[in-house]
Regions:
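Short, well-structured alpha-helical segments that form the helix of a local strand-helix-strand
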Residues: 401-407, 476-485, 500
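Divalent metal-coordination and catalytic microenvironments
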Residues: 9, 29, 49, 60, ...
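Active-site neighborhoods of metal-dependent hydrolases
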Residues: 133-137, 143, 149-159, 166-174, ...
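Histidine-rich, glycine-flanked metal-binding segment
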Residues: 1-5, 11-55, 521
Length: 574
């Protein structure tokens, strides 16, 4: 007898085939039958009117630290994610020598905006090597499965010490050691290696990260570990200032290792055609038999701004900045004072404070046409009429008056799309989502605690692209499900999941598609040391099943902890 039979749902099995009705049977953590009418089971779940999909496989998170203190891995678990991969963007916490722990926390804070006090309180540091780190992850109970990649920054600091932090060139011996560490990581189950080559990744002091200037000899030398072991992918984030150089070494990496190479791709205001040039290069590489892939986001990556967030238009005004150390409720109480409002609105941005900001953050003080109000549920494809500049023009107010009152009086968050919104709509994203050379990722779960929360991306993909979009064509649900199940699983070699077919791991979502909606992001204080972060919930998930065990029912955790560390090269994963 089966353990569970899900009866009469609309099955979208993750393969891309058309939806069909039927049952899904589960026994011993595996799917035993899909479709038709199945026999009795110890538990039967009525899925009439529900969509039945594989659990989401999210391959771009930053739960490297949170996986040590949070068995849920929220918010991802609230959105049907059953497998989360971290170690992205070259940042992580292993390997590490004791005297470099602070440096790695600084790098994680600078790159992914996870505060130092949170990391200091939450990390146990019961490891030095990457195998030690994997063992520490494996010892913990958790709700969903996790998978790790080896990150460049910690291994560069481990091998080179302060020379890495000063971004000195790696010697041949340095490269050999990093290659050995990477091979060791792959053998104990890392799914690949990642690095960062972007100026947007800096330490809290504004210094570029240790891997920023690594040359092709270093990258190719480390990458050769992938061909030695015969496993893993090579991932990279770059500004592509020298496109020819970057593409040349990526092609060489793919050719010499025979392993998949991927990079992060978005459109950018400063170079709207860059993404097209890069995709042309990807297709050319593929035509030459090379495995080169662009990892993309399914919506604009944008910063939310309000009271208590990492940034808002008034954080560079002296009077406002003086209040930032106060509790959020007290900040708002004072900001509601009409006299204080007049004083802040009359102030000019502090030039010294502005100079400390990145180029993007400087835009936040001036580009009122790029600020948008958010609804509940939030609208991630707002039209130009929703911008602060447009509202100000219609109502005969100044833009900063509109922004101040929205943030303070209405206690709301403004949305500033950083990338993927050059055209003011989602048409570029739609083109990317239709390109088989693109892989869906970039949810960034666990990162950018007080500025971004994109971990609800799986729910957004279905609700927005499959049902709610009004400013352009929608996409088929079968395509959207495949994009975040079998495609992501297959790319990284997670060969036992991502499809509802017999023999596969029984990771399943039951979704009331008509009710599926994202909530407005919420700022909460639930991290170690009282740290705050944005979270975002969703309605519509009737149940999420992991390894054949219900872990969430109607949005509530059942108490079950079937999650584990998935190791590449073990149990058939490669």
């Amino acid at each position: 007898m089966d353990d569970i039979v899900i009866r009469g749902g609309t099955i979208i099995d993750g393969t891309g085939k058309a939806a069909f009705s039927g049952d899904v049977a589960i026994a011993d953590g595996r799917i035993t039958a899909v479709g038709g009418k199945q026999g009795p089971a110890r538990r039967e779940i009525d899925a009439t009117g529900l969509m039945v999909t594989p659990g989401w496989v999210d391959v771009h998170t930053h739960y490297d630290g949170q996986a040590m203190w949070d068995p849920l891995l929220a918010p991802s678990c609230w959105h049907g994610v059953t497998t989360a991969m971290f170690g992205n963007c070259g940042v992580g916490f292993a390997p590490v020598k004791k005297h470099h722990r602070q440096a790695l926390m600084d790098l994680m804070e600078g790159v992914e905006e996870i505060p130092n006090p949170v990391l200091a309180a939450g990390l146990t540091w019961e490891w030095e090597t990457f195998p030690d780190f994997m063992d520490a992850l494996e010892r913990r109970e958790r709700v969903i499965d996790i998978a790790a990649q080896a990150a460049h920054l910690p291994m560069r600091v481990y091998v080179m010490g302060d020379r890495a932090i000063r971004r000195e060139k790696a010697t041949a011996d340095d490269i050999a050691q990093m290659r050995q560490i990477t091979a060791e990581a792959l053998r104990v189950g890392a799914f690949g290696f990642t690095t960062s080559r972007t100026d947007s990744h800096k330490t809290p002091d504004g210094e570029l990260v240790p891997s920023r200037d690594a040359d092709d000899l270093e990258l190719l030398g480390i990458g050769s570990a992938l061909s030695e072991v015969g496993a893993g992918t090579f991932g990279m984030n770059s500004d592509f200032d020298d496109e020819d150089y970057e593409l040349r070494w990526m092609r060489k990496q793919a050719r010499e290792t025979g392993r998949p190479v991927w990079f992060l791709l978005t459109d950018r205001f400063e170079d709207p055609e860059r993404w097209r040039r890069l995709m042309k290069a990807v297709h050319a590489a593929r035509a030459d038999g090379l495995s080169l892939t662009a990892q993309i986001a399914g919506r604009p990556i944008g910063v939310m701004m309000g009271i208590g967030t990492a940034l808002n238009p008034f954080t560079v005004r002296p009077t406002y900045k003086a209040l930032e150390s106060l509790p959020i409720a007290e900040q708002r109480r004072r900001l509601l004072d009409p006299e204080l409002r007049r004083k802040i609105l009359a102030e000019k941005p502090d030039a010294a404070e502005v100079a400390k900001l990145s180029q993007f953050r400087q835009l936040v003080t001036t580009r009122w046409d790029k600020f948008f109000t958010m609804d509940d549920p939030p609208d991630y494809e707002p039209g130009p009429e929703r911008s602060v500049a447009a509202i100000a023009a219609r109502t005969n107010h100044t833009p900063d008056e509109i922004a101040y009152d929205y943030i303070v009086e209405e206690n709301q968050y403004l949305f500033f799309p950083v990338v993927n919104y050059v055209t003011g709509d989602h048409e570029v994203i739609r083109e990317m989502l239709g390109d088989p050379a693109c892989l869906l990722g970039l949810s960034d779960g666990g990162a950018h605690c007080t500025s971004i929360v994109d971990s609800g991306l799986p729910s957004f993909m279905l609700a927005h692209w499959g049902r709610d979009r009004r400013r352009g064509p929608r996409l088929p649900l079968e395509h959207l499900v495949k994009r975040q199940t079998s495609e992501t699983a297959d790319f990284f070699g997670l060969s036992d999941r991502g499809r509802l077919v017999p023999g596969m791991r029984a990771d399943v979502n039951l979704i009331d598609f008509d009710r599926l909606r994202l909530h407005k992001p919420e700022l909460v204080h639930d991290m170690p040391a009282g740290g705050r972060r944005f979270v975002q919930r969703a309605d519509g998930y009737e149940a999420t099943i992991a390894a054949g065990i219900p872990i969430f029912e109607r949005g509530e955790h059942t108490g079950a902890m079937p999650g584990r560390l998935v190791r590449a090269g073990h149990n058939g994963h490669r």
